[in-house]
Amino acid sequence: MAKMTVRGLEDKIAELEALSIQAPEIIRRTLYEGAGVVADNMRQAIQGIPTDNRIGTPENPVYGIQPLQKKGLEESFGITPMKHENDGYNVLIGFDGYNGIRTKKYPGGQPNQLIARSVERGTSFRRAYPFIKKTVRSSKAAAQKKMLETYEEEVNKIMK
């Protein structure tokens, strides 16, 4: 009868166990690296939004936002904490909070998400300046590449 001896199997099993224990941290680092690429590009896109102090009308819409609205977008943009959901792990990038322009309708300031959406899609008094969709689309490949590099680097640290 033939005999076979396998050496190093215990080491491989230990590496795989270490990998499974550290998987959430590897996923977190990978997701944040990819989101960071998109977020950096989005910050540049926000800086590129034209400013306009005029008040738009349907007959004469503005093409841009007020400087204080732009400042609110710049300051409120960020990445959410990682969440584990049914279909996997997610991080989101977006706008939060309110800018400093207080109105009768918004005494606490205008919602930054509302301003970003109105710039992206346009309104009856503002022409669209689609910066979000364009930035996400152009950043996708670089973000995926960075995520793959980070993942491989983290796995290679464990699987020596």
Residue ranges and their predicted role:
Residues 1-3, 16, 65, 74, ...:
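Generic secondary-structure boundary/loop-capping signal
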Residues 21-122, 159-160:
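Short, low-complexity, charged/polar segments at coil/turn and helix-coil boundaries
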Residues 17, 21-32, 133, 137, ...:
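Short amphipathic alpha-helical segments with heptad-repeat character
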Residues 113-160:
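Lipid-handling modules and contact-site tethers
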Residues 1-25:
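N-terminal, Lys/Arg- and Ser/Thr-rich interaction peptides
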